[in-house]
Amino acid sequence: MAPKYELDQLVNSICKSTRDTDASKILKEIEDNNSYITEVQLKRLLKLHDGSFRESLTPLQKLHDKYNEIVMRQGDLQSWAELIDRDLRVLELTMQLAKRR
């Protein structure tokens, strides 16, 4: 019985110890880094990507609105497709030129 009691005391002293070990220091650093990443960096990244997304979405939304009005007015699907095709070709050429620079 004595060894079990001593073992229980040893386990309790280890578990209830207030001294920092190397492992606990590393764990605290990892938790702090995780907290910083989720609370600061992730918010900045989302804000940056939201802005970029809105910037790229606005021209597409304008194209949609422009051609949606034309289709509703005319109902001519062929001319609508030709207009969209022309604008998409212009966008593709613009993207190619931007990539070269």
From Swiss-Prot:
The keyword Transport applies. GO terms for cellular component: endosome. The keyword DNA-binding does not apply. It comes from the Eukaryota. It is found in: Endosome. Its main location: other. Keywords: Endosome, Transport. Component of the biogenesis of lysosome-related organelles complex-1 (BLOC-1). Component of the biogenesis of lysosome-related organelles complex-1 (BLOC-1), a complex involved in endosomal cargo sorting. Belongs to the BLOC1S1 family. This is Biogenesis of lysosome-related organelles complex 1 subunit BLS1. It comes from Zygosaccharomyces rouxii (strain ATCC 2623 / CBS 732 / NBRC 1130 / NCYC 568 / NRRL Y-229). The lineage of its organism: Eukaryota, Fungi, Dikarya, Ascomycota, Saccharomycotina. The gene is BLS1.
